[in-house]
Amino acid sequence: MISSVFPALPVATPFLGAGLLGATQSLGRRRLAEAIAIATAVAATVLCAIDLVLAIRHGDAVTWFGGWQPRHGVAIGVSFTIDPLGAGLATFVGLLTIAALVFSWRHFESVGHVFPALLLVFMAAMMGFSLSGDIFNLFVFFELMSIAGIGLTCHRPDEGAPLQGALNFAITNAIGGFLVLIGIALLYGRTGALNLAQIGAMLDGHRADGLVLVSFGLIVSGFFVKAAVVPFHFWLADAYATAPTPVCILFAGVMSELGLYAVARIYWVVYAGTLGSHQEALRTILLTAGALTALLGATMCFLQRHLKRMLAFATISYVGCFLVGIALLDSGGLAGTAIYVVADGLVKASLFICVGVLQHRCSRVDERHLHGLGRNLPFTGIVFFVGALALAGLPPFGSFLGKSTIEDAALARGYWWVPALFTVAEIITSAAVVRAAGRVFLGWGPRDASGPAGEDRADEETSQEIEGRNDRTPALLWLPAAILLLAGLAVGLVPGVDRVAQAAAARFVDRQGYIAAVLHARPPATLPPVSVSGPSLADYLYAAGSSLGALLLGLGALLLPRHAHDSPSVIFRRARAAAGWIRGLHSGHPGDYVAWVTAGTAILAGAFALTLR
C-alpha cells in the first residue's frame, strides 16, 4: 500500500484551475481562459492516470487528510482511497472533460470564464466522488456535482427551455441528495462512523435491522436518481435536451454511471457483510430494476425525434444494462460493467458531438427538420452511423467486450434471459440512431415535419450554441467525435483489457482487503489469478443479431410507407396508444417527477424491507 498526498492532487488541480479562471476574469481574454481550462484538465487527467498505474502495480493508495490516520481500527479523519476501478473512473472523467473543453473552444462568448470554470468544478466533483473513502464526502461531492451541473444546464437563464431543464434537474436531484443524506444519518446513528471501511467493519456479521435496511433503501434510491434508473429517470431527458453539447458529453458519458458506482461501492464495503445471506433476493430486485430501465429507455429512445432526447433515453437504456451487470453481485459482472461503461461512454460522447456539429451547421436537432441537411457532412455522417452500430455492440468495439463479459457472468448464475434482454434493448436503441442517420445524412424516408404530440418542442429547446459563422465546420468540432469513436474501438482491441478489468473488479469486491488497507494499513491478501476466456461463439452470434436487427428495424421504420403509420390495424392502433401513454408519463412537470421519485423510493425500500430481513 502507498500512502501519500499525491492521490488527492487530481481533485485539487481542477479546483485550483477554476480559482485561477476567477482570478483572471478581469483580463477578459476568452482564449486564455479556455487554454487554462484545457491545461488544467490535462494535468488532472495525467495525475489520475498515474494514480491508476500505481494502484494496479502497488495496491490501493490511501490518503488521510491532515494526518488523521486510524487508531485501533477507528477512523476519525477523512480519506481518499484509490483502487483501480475508482482511479480508472476518475481518469475517464478527465478524458471526457478534455473532449468537452476542446469541443467548447468556440462556445459561449457571452459567459466568458464562467463556463470553463464550472466545467472544472464539475470535473473535480466527479473525480472526488470516484476517490472518496468517506460516505459523507460522497454526499458532498454528489451535491457539488448537482450544483455545477445545474449551472451548466442553465447556461442561458434568459431562455425558457434551459431554465426549465435546470429546474427539473435541481428539484429531482435535490430530493435524491436528501434521500442519501437521511440514509447516511441513519447509518451514523447506528455505527457512529462515516468512513466506509469502518462502517462496513462495524456492521460485518450482524443481522441487518430495520434501521440498516431503511438506510440502504434511502441511499440506493438517492443514487438511483443520479443514475436515472426507472422510475427515478424523468429529469434526465429534459436536462440533456437543453444542456449545451459539451455538458451532454459528461452527463451521458459518466455522470449517470457515477450513481451506479456509488451503489456498488457502498454495497460491497458497507452492506455486503450484513446482507450477504440475502444476495439472491437482492439480485432479483436489482435485476428487475435494471431490466425495466433497459427496456423503457430503449422504447422511449425509439419514440424520439429530438436527437438529444434520443441519446438521453439511450443513456437510460444502457444504465439499465450496467445495473444488470452490477446486480449479479460478482466480480465477473462488475468487470464487464466497467468495460461497458467506458466503451459506451466514449461512443455516446462521439454521438453527442455529431449532434453538436449538426446544431452548429443547421441550428436544429430534430431529425425530421434535418431531413437531408447532413448530406454535405459526410464525415460526420459516417461517424454517426458507425456510432449507432457500436451502440448495438458491434465487434470489435469495447461495448461488445463489456456486454459479452456480463452475459457470460449472468449465464454462469443461471440468468439465461440476460443476453436476450441486452439484444432487445440494443436493437431498439441502435435502430433509433440508425433511423436518424438515414434521415439526416442520406435524406431517406418521408419529409414529414409533423410528429407525435410532445415532440414538436424541439425547436424551442434548441438554441444556437456556437457563435459566429456556421457555413463550415472547424476541425475542433468534428475531430473529437472521430477520436472518441476510435477510442471506443480501441477498448475492444487492446490486448489484456478484460484481464485488467477482471483483476480490478476482484479487488473491488474484496471488502476485507479494502477494510484492512484503510483501517490497518495492511496490503490486501493476494487474490487468485484471474481466468479470462474471452467472448464465445454465442457472444458473437448475439452481437451479429443485435447489429443486423438494429439495421433492419431502423431502416424499416425509415422506409415504411407513410400511410402505414395510420394503419387501422388493431396492432398498430394499440402500439400507438401504448406509445402515447408512455410518452405522456414524461410530462416535463417537476411535480410529476417528484411523485415518481417518491413512489420509486417507497417501492424499492419496501422491497428491501420485505425480502432482506
Model feature map: region roles:
Residues V11-L21, A41-D51, A90-L101, M123-M126, ...:
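Helical transmembrane-bundle signal
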Residues V500, G606-R613:
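Juxtamembrane boundary at the C-terminal end of a transmembrane helix
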Residues M1-A8, L16-L119, A197-A201, L555-L559, ...:
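Transmembrane helix-loop-helix hairpins at membrane boundaries of multipass inner-membrane proteins
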Residues A243, G374-T380, S430-S547, H565-I603:
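Cytoplasmic/organellar membrane-interface segments at the starts of transmembrane helices
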Residues P7-G17, A33-L47, G86-V93, F115-F122, ...:
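Hydrophobic alpha-helical transmembrane segments of polytopic
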Residues G77-V93, A208-F223, P419-E426, A521-L553, ...:
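Hydrophobic alpha-helical transmembrane segments
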Residues A99-E109, H113, M123-L138, A148-E461:
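Hydrophobic transmembrane alpha-helices and their helix-loop junctions in integral membrane proteins
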Residues V53-A61, L186-L196, A264-A272, L391-I406, ...:
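Membrane-helix interface motif
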